[in-house]
Amino acid sequence: HKAIRRQRQMCIRDRVNIGAFTGKTIIDPLRNVIGEQAYIYINYFSGAMTIIALLAVILLYKSTHTAGEGKSLREISRGFMKIITNWRLLILILIVTGFWMVQQQLYATMPKYVIRMAGETAKPGWIANVNPFVVVCFVSFITRLMAKRSAITSMNVGMFLIPFSALLMACGNLLGNDIISGMSNITLMMVAGIIVQALAECFISPRYLEYFSLQAPKGEEGMYLGFSHLHSFLSSIFGFGLAGILLTKYCPDPTLFETHAAWEAASVNAHYIWYYFAAIGLIAAIALLLFAKITESIDKKKEASR
């Protein structure tokens, strides 16, 4: 039942984002103690938590629903081929990759951008925590609000919020005097953009997983949902790669310059980075709108021919 599927996806998002929030509380205190080495040691912490979680699942989790479990590698390979030869699912994965490329900038661009532009006292860990906090607070409400709308419609709303979020992030470097005393405009507008980005995630993620699960043959829902996260693989590769190129071009490392004035001249257009991601988000949003129109037209023709 669709309502049950939505409830499951909301529960998944809540747990993922609670973990995302608590995990990020470590990085800023660690950075205050050991400096840049924190970005190395945080990976050890993440690895340890992952191993503990894996052992907990192996030892404690027992499913009462065994349909679709225990598949061989050959069956998994066949399932993968079914998905990549299903043009609807493949195109949807590629489109949603555009959203996640922008979302990945919480980790790829934002930390270095904020520290370089707002100063060493900036707290990128807490800034990034705005995302999971907003998702946990609003995902249930938004999913219920859009319950009578199709999954694609809900996703479209979120997709068109994404370019707006990137433009808000760019505004931090365009404003004059600080709007809020004690908080740089870079930080303020980054938080504003992340709030909008998190709301977009509330519209997109649960309904994306719902759409994927509805396309799966009975007993293969788990495998299809697993492959639905191919967007994470693609968005990480392309999102982090592009972030490195854009940071080098528009917001380079200050230690590479002899004077602060030379660095300021090199980073005067640092906000251009967010224009690129606004464009990616807008292209993805338009692509999803076209996808919805085309698939709806095809489905109507099939219904009429029956």
Feature-to-residue mapping (PLM):
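Helix-to-loop junctions at the C-terminal end of transmembrane segments
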Residues: 31, 137-157
